[in-house]
Swiss-Prot record:
Lineage: Eukaryota, Fungi, Fungi incertae sedis, Mucoromycota, Mucoromycotina
Cellular compartments per GO CC: 3-isopropylmalate dehydratase complex
UniProt-annotated stretches for the region Disordered: 427-446, 471-493, 510-529
Stored SUPFAM superfamilies: Aconitase iron-sulfur domain, LeuD/IlvD-like
Compositional bias segments (type: Low complexity): 510-528
Enzyme class, broadest EC rank: lyase
Name used for this protein in its record: 3-isopropylmalate dehydratase
GO biological-process terms attached to the record: L-leucine biosynthetic process
Gene3D superfamilies: Aconitase, domain 3, Aconitase, domain 4
Function of the protein: Catalyzes the isomerization between 2-isopropylmalate and 3-isopropylmalate, via the formation of 2-isopropylmaleate.
Length: 755
């Protein structure tokens, strides 16, 4: 039987396979940043372990850094004002020096967002495996790479062993054929796809995007699509490499050359899915059905055409979906049936790992040219890397933006997640080219609407969500739309002064303290986990669908270099009043006996969707909750739970609702992992768990220690890899799996990469 693109890449990276199907796969490329790596390096240090393949590892700072001008930059210690952010960046600089890793610091023109710098350096190549402690690692799948985000425990695992323990996902194909309408971009396509299949539509799968719509895309457009495959619940997204791919890679600093290039291209051509390959899930979409699209709510699946209106929850029969829709409309400050083009905005963000590349900036500049940002709008453009910024300035794009009233910034993640100074204030509405519109994602109380760079630029110059086709040359002879009326959304008055708005964009505050109980013991950083056999206690009931990682632990609590102390941050935005820090008495964890909960029962599906950050399970562990029961889980969160000695249990909807009713009656539940049952007063419910994961939990085993027992298999694979795919090794690797070549952070831009 034929194989898919995913099958082929997976098969070429299996180091070992266990009886239950768990595989040890080799990781070719590892990207590291400041937020999800400190605890991983600490684990290596405590266990006396080294980084196995420095030549396959690349580090940079992106999430926490300011995007203000760097003309007076000396070092991160003096430049980054916010203490926790500064500590994370300083810690990364210390770690890359100690462990001998290549690092693009803030004084290096190559610094930028991890998922921008990997491709532009030629670090990302077709057919390779790519990991990063960031869920949008799926971006690199645009090259035909198997790329997926991992948690901090797995970051440590890759650093130590250059491998991961994984179960193979299902194959899913999303095919988009036909002629695209004018004004429709890759961002519109992927938002439309997510709207069709939902944020859990790809759960348990790797999506292969195919069809004429993707074949005609540039590499940068393909990256935007694969970037957001995680928002559809998929483990990864992939597009088969072709001539467009090869031309993009050719000549990049880390791309193969000469005979190696020819051999590489021959291999890359072989990766395309076979004609008779079988897929577990097939989705077909007519390109003609896709219009310029944006989000209306607080989930990437809450999408609507720019010509459409917000939905009406009263027409939805499913109570969980109706409740989620009502909650989203309430948070976003819009009423049912509101025309999207009548919604007034406050800010515009053009940037993020989804849309901060040169083509994105060109598209936005084409709309901005000759126009000006609306008087009440603050608009910012944040290039994805120093090299993108430099190229844009060479093309004069910066002048177009500045003349139009946009703020032209330095490279970084910026307002995508508001961990840095670039944030929304409560009530502010933002047209954003980023990838997530969760509650509080861009700042507490901020209202995020996702869209393409061209659509964001159109919103900036009109002050309202606008059909970009009205502003493009081919559409200028169309009759003008009626003057949009302002929608009353209970916003705070918008900032009128642009200088003042820019200053406010740089305000960041520390996480507020709370009076919650002290944290419970957490797993050791060095090795091993507490054993999990049985767990008895109160179970907190929660009736929310699509509980995302930003809801579980808001971004302001991610700026830590430890795994502990996060119990007070669990569900902070709905557990506490953001302004006063006072408890919300209506939230279940603030009620007795649920303050002592050891189990959580959530009746809504897709629990833990969103980021790969391991801070979410750390927060649960620190609070004292070690088991979560739900109808379904997002893949990365599900995996991260096991890495932290926690047990996520998937049960049918009716069983979850039954257990939730017992929880609401304040009855204790018992999770018996050994016998694989959940006991409740008068009965029990069986559950499934993978044998290897059960074995590790029951015995408190350390994945890294287990993997290191297979050193001979890893070494044999590396020898085969060097012979078969030599372009994947660093230039001076020569079989030396622990070679270190430190790169001093203050001279990185002057040194030639020793790969």
């Amino acid at each position: 039987m034929g194989r898919t693109l995913y099958d082929k890449v997976w098969d070429d990276h299996v180091v070992d396979q266990q009886e239950d199907g768990t595989c040890l796969i080799y990781i070719d490329r590892h990207l590291v940043h400041e937020v999800t790596s400190p605890q991983a390096f600490e684990g290596l240090r405590n266990a006396g372990r080294k980084v196995r393949r420095p030549d396959c590892t690349l580090a940079t700072v992106d999430h926490n850094i300011p995007t203000t001008p760097r003309k007076n930059f000396k070092n991160v210690s003096t430049f980054i004002q916010e203490a926790d952010s500064r500590t994370q960046c300083e810690t990364l600089e210390h770690n890359v020096k100690e462990f001998g890793l290549t690092y693009f610091g803030m004084d290096d023109s190559r610094q930028g967002i991890v998922h921008v710098i990997g491709p532009e350096q030629g670090f990302t190549l077709p057919g390779c495996t790519v990991n990063c402690g960031d869920s949008h690692t799926s971006t690199h799948g645009a090259f035909g790479a198997l790329a997926f985000g991992i948690g901090t425990s797995e970051v440590e695992h890759v650093l130590a062993t250059q491998t991961l323990l994984q179960k193979k996902s299902k194959n899913m194909r999303v095919k988009v054929d036909g002629k695209l309408a004018p004004g429709v971009t890759s961002k519109d396509i992927v938002l439309h796809i997510i709207g069709v299949i939902g944020t859990a539509g790809g759960t348990g799968c790797v999506i292969e995007f195919c069809g004429s719509a993707f074949e005609q895309m540039s590499m940068e457009a393909r990256m935007s699509v694969c970037n957001m495959s995680i928002e559809a619940g998929a483990r990864a997204g992939m597009i088969a490499p072709d001539e467009t791919t090869f031309e993009y890679i050719r000549g990049r600093p880390l791309a193969p050359t000469g005979a190696e290039w020819d051999k590489a291209v021959e291999y890359w051509r072989s990766l395309r899915s076979d004609p008779d390959a079988k897929y577990d899930v097939d989705v077909f979409i007519d390109a003609a059905d896709i219009a310029p699209t944006l989000t209306w709510g607080t989930s990437p699946q809450d999408v609507v055409a720019i010509t459409g209106t917000t939905p009406d929850p009263s027409t939805v029969s499913d109570p969980i979906r109706r409740q989620a829709m009502e909650r989203a409309l309430d948070y976003i400050g819009l009423k049912p049936n509101t025309p999207m083009q009548e919604v007034k905005i406050d800010k515009v963000f053009i940037g993020s790992c989804t849309n901060s590349r040169i083509e994105d900036l060109r598209a936005a500049a084409a709309i901005a040219k000759g126009r000006h940002v609306a008087d009440w709008v603050y608009a910012m453009v944040v290039p994805g890397s120093g090299l993108v910024k430099k190229q844009a300035e060479q093309e004069g794009l910066d002048r177009i933006f500045k003349e139009a009233g946009f703020d032209w910034r330095e490279a970084g993640c910026s307002m995508c997640l508001g961990m840095n100074p670039d944030q929304l204030k409560p009530g502010e509405r933002c047209a954003s080219t980023s990838n997530r519109n969760f509650e509080g994602r861009q700042g507490a109380g901020g209202r995020t609407h996702l869209m393409s760079p061209a659509m964001a630029a159109a919103a900036a110059v009109t002050g309202y969500f606008t059909d970009v086709r009205k502003l493009t040359p081919a559409q200028q002879d169309r009759p003008a739309s009626p003057t949009p009326k302002k929608i009353e959304t209970e916003l705070e008055p918008p900032v009128e002064d642009h200088a003042k708005a820019a200053d406010q964009a740089d305000i960041v505050t520390d996480a507020p303290a709370t009076g919650a109980s002290p944290p419970s013991p957490a797993p050791s950083d060095a090795a091993g986990m507490p054993k999990f056999t049985t767990l008895r206690g109160y179970a907190a009931p929660l009736d929310i669908a699509n509980v995302d990682t930003d809801m579980i632990i808001p971004k302001q609590f991610l700026k830590t270099i430890k795994r502990t102390g996060l119990g007070t941050a669990l569900f902070y935005n709905i557990r506490f009043d953001g302004a006063t820090g006072e408890e919300n008495p209506d939230f279940v964890l603030n009620q007795e006996p649920y303050r002592q909960s050891r189990i959580l029962v959530c009746t809504g599906p897709n629990f833990g969707c969103g980021s790969s950050r391991e801070h979410a399970p750390w927060a649960f562990n620190d609070f004292g909750i070690r088991s979560i029961i739900a109808p379904s889980f997002a893949d990365i969160f599900f995996n991260n739970c096991f890495k932290n000695g926690m047990l996520p249990i998937t049960l049918p909807q009716d069983k979850v609702e039954m257990l939730a009713e017992h929880a609401k009656q304040k009855a204790e539940l018992e999770v018996d992992l050994v016998n694989q049952v959940v006991r409740y007063p008068g009965g029990e419910v069986p559950f499934d768990v993978e044998p290897f994961r059960k074995h590790c939990l029951v015995n408190g085993l350390d994945d890294i220690g287990l993997t290191m027992q297979k050193a001979d298999l890893i070494e044999a694979f590396e020898a085969k890899r060097s012979q078969t795919w030599p372009w994947l090794d660093g230039k001076d690797y020569a079989g030396k799996a622990t070679k270190f070549t430190p790169v001093a952070t203050n001279t990185a831009k002057k040194q030639k990469l020793d790969w």
